[in-house]
């Protein structure tokens, strides 16, 4: 597949065949490592040859985004990633917050995060919001939604460190699995440390809910 130009007519067929072969291999790591070494000769075009089926390739995709991502618009990156790394495309996709400031803020935030850049214009917004804190007036506090929740036969998952940036990913995965999603966005209490934001645990426990406390994402972010 590396001998074929990714723009050629037969490339996608060969690309899908390679993905199928990788899926069948019990231990594809050695082959994948060699593949990634050779792939480096492709430069900016290497993204079109990668898949999300092995760890070395995923890491290669992240490195490519850091090296070349800012040369592409958000929509262009979503289009590329939808083929090579769908879950990452889901993360980068838009989520509508019913507020233009939040829409723009989180689209820019995710784009910069995925391309490993901080743009001066965004840095200015962050500095301004540290004082203005518009999100306080835009979003209701989390406690405002607790009494509205239907907790009968409910299972609660408390995923530490999972902010609203992941809502597009969650929404897309729900659609993929045929699940319905009713999403309400709220703000946490400041400071945003977990120890100051667990009041809902006792409230929901008192209502008889089973609560799963998931810290995997928080551990990844901090370590």
Which residues does each PLM region occupy?
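…; additionally, a secondary subgroup of soluble metalloenzymes is captured
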Residues: 1-154, 161-223
